[in-house]
Amino acid sequence: MISFVGAGPGAADLVTLRGAERLAAADVVIWASSLVPGALLDHCGPAVTVHDSATMTLEDVLAVYAAHDDATTIVRLHSGDPSLYGAIQEQIDWCHAHDRRWEIVPGVSSVSAASALAGRELTIPGVSQTVVLTRLAGRTAASMPGDTGVAAFARHGATMAVLLSAARPDELQAELLGPDSAYRVDTPTVIVVRATWPDEQVVHGTVGTLADDLRATGATMTALVLVGDALATTESERRSHLYAPAYTTAYRLRSEAGSAAGRPSARRSPGQATQSGEDRPVELGADHQISSPTRP
């Protein structure tokens, strides 16, 4: 079995329980020393064989897989969450082609870690309900589909998380302030370098100071930039509709007149929900059933 495990943003105790279990049971681990702290390997057993992928090509990694049969427990340890810029699809394709069992163990993304360190919610009602994850094209421009980069998404003014772009601060600032951008020079930014590592840096600034702020960190990799009005450090006057006294859910009725206290609804079965604006449950149809995906 080959497990693509998300290591989380850095701190060894931010790997998931399942990820730690897979590391503890692994016969072989492939990890990138340039992106994942060595402390993550403390979760491994004493007999594990470790390969550092920092100097390996895809072909080198696949050769390690091919050298072991399906009974060998292999962990490919990726930084953050494997589904985000993890280059795992080409490895999954190999598993399909060679009839190998595999799984993805999700990890805590650096985006989540960065927002936690910034101390801000990324989706503030009435400010932004959308988070865009993107990057500058850079040396891998061929991988970037047309009109899907930073400048294109800047037109919407949503909260943006820009990864893999710290080495080009002037280009990043220019795209964020393009002629069609909804961002302003005073739009808040937060730069997070090596989130949850011992030497992490958190820098609050604005789009107008972003290039200088990035250069001041000295970082050219493992840095993430958050952009958007949701990052404003002033107290927001907006509030969630979900917890508003007048809002009804499957578990809470709208509050009594003159009161803001919650009013529990009657016990409902897992197949029931409440229609918006009504105090009665409705049965979900068969096409609304939630099921777990089948593991590969």
For the regions a language model picked out, list residue spans one by one.
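Short alpha-helices
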Residues: S109-A113, G119, T222-A223
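Residue-level signal for pocket-adjacent positions within structured domains
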Residues: P9-G10, S79-G80, L117, G126-S128, ...
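Class I S-adenosyl-L-methionine
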Residues: M1-A113, A211, T274, R295
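Short, glycine-/small-residue-rich phosphate/pyrophosphate-handling segment
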Residues: S115-A142
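A contiguous loop/helix-start segment that scaffolds small-molecule binding in enzyme catalytic cores
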Residues: I2, D60, V64, T72-I74, ...
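Residue-level signal for well-ordered alpha-helical positions
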Residues: D42-H43, L117-A118, E175
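Short, hinge-like loop/turn segments at secondary-structure boundaries
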Residues: A47-T49, R120-P125, P179, V207-T209
